[in-house]
Amino acid sequence: MSPLVTITGDGTFRLGTGAIGNDVAEDPFLLALMRLRSLLGDPPEEQIATRLYLPSALGLDDTDHLLPATLALLAGTSGDLASYGWRLGPGIGRAWQRAQDVRDRTLDAARIALLGYEGPLAVTAMGPVTLAAATFLPSGERTLADRGAVRDLPMLLAEGLGEHLALLRERVPGARPHLLLREDAVNAVVEGRIPTPSGRRTYPAFPAPEAGTLWQCLMAGLRTVSVLDPESITLGIGTDVTVLRTAREIGVRRLAVSPARLPSLETPAGRVLWEELAAAHDSGCHLELAVDPRPGGGMTAVLDGVLESWQKLGYAVRDAAGFTLIAHTGASHAVRSGKPDPSQQPAASTLLDEATIEALLRAAPAWAERVER
C-alpha cells in the first residue's frame, strides 16, 4: 500500500546548543546522523512514510553549508573561498579542503550511525543553475557569465554525485539513495535578476529551456554513473511558470515547490501556475511541498490552502494522497525572490533542527487523515 504522505527534510540539520558530548566522542557528524535516524529512520505510522537524509549542512563553520557541500562534489574541480565568494579555479584552498573533509566525515559517520539501516536515504545538492549564480570564476565574474563553464557543471556534478553515492552505498548497504536537487535561485536566474560583481547591473536572463537542458544532462549523467533514475530525483524549483513547464516537459518525475510562495489561484498568474502543477500531477509527476513547521511558519494555513486550491481545480482531497512534505525554514524563499545574493552564506538559524522536524512529524497524522477520505 502506498503511503498517504512522506515526511522528510531539506537536507540541513543544526544541532542544538550543548548537544555535543562525550557520548559520541564529541563527533557532531555522528551525533547529527544518530538524531536524524531517531527522527526519520522509522515510519511513525503504517501509512506515513519517512525519507531519512544525509545532512549536507550542519552550520558548524563558514564552510559547512549547502553551497560548499555541493562544490566538494564537483568531480575534478578545485577552488577556494575568496573575499567575494566561492571561486572555481586552479588550486585547492583551505576552505575548499575543509568542505571536502566535512563530506568525508559525514560518510564515515554514516557507517556507524546507520548500521543495519534499510530504506530511503537522501543526499542534497544545489542544482547547476543555482551553482552558476552562486559561484565565481578566477576573473571575479560569476560562473553564470561563462556559458561554457555553465554547460560543464551538470556533468561535473553528475560524476561527483555518482562517486559520492557509490561510497554511500558501500557504507550503508541497505540504503536506497535519493537526490534532492535544490534550485533555490532558478527564478532569479531565469528572470535576469542576478547582480554582477559591481552591483550596477544584472546578468541577462537565462532561458528556462536552457535550464532544462542542464537538468537533462545531469539526469542522464546520473543514470549512467550511479543508476539513479528520475523517480529517485526530486527537483526543487521556484514559482516561475516557464521553469515549472520546462521541468515537466523534460520528464522530471518529482517536483518540490513551496506553496507559501505560490500566488493565489484567484489571480491570473496563480491560475496558470496551479494548472501547470495539476498538469504535472496528471502526467504522473510526484509533488513535494516544502513547508515551515516552526511556530509562526504558517504551515497549517498553507496546507489548508493547498487542499482548497486542489479542490477548486476539480480534484478530490483524496487526490493529494501520496504528496511528500519537506520540512524547510523558508530561508530560500527570499533567494527565489531575488532579495539576498545566492552566493552569500546563510545564517545557521536557517537550518533545520530537531524541533522543526518533530513538529512536521506531529502534523503528519492529521494531514494523512484528511487525504484518506
Task: For each feature predicted by the language model, list its residue ranges.
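Glycine-rich anion/phosphate-binding loops
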Residues: 95-111, 151-164, 305
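Active-site-proximal loop/short-helix segments
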Residues: 122-141, 172-203, 239, 252
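Alpha/beta catalytic barrel-like cores
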Residues: 1-126, 131-145, 319-321, 333-373
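Acidic, His- and aromatic-enriched active-site or binding-groove loops in soluble protein domains
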Residues: 142-160, 196-223, 254-267
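Catalytic-face loop-and-helix region of soluble metabolic enzyme cores
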Residues: 253-373
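Structural preference for beta-strand elements that scaffold enzyme active sites
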Residues: 2-8, 12-16, 45-55, 120-122, ...
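Secondary-structure boundary elements
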Residues: 115-117, 155-178, 217-230
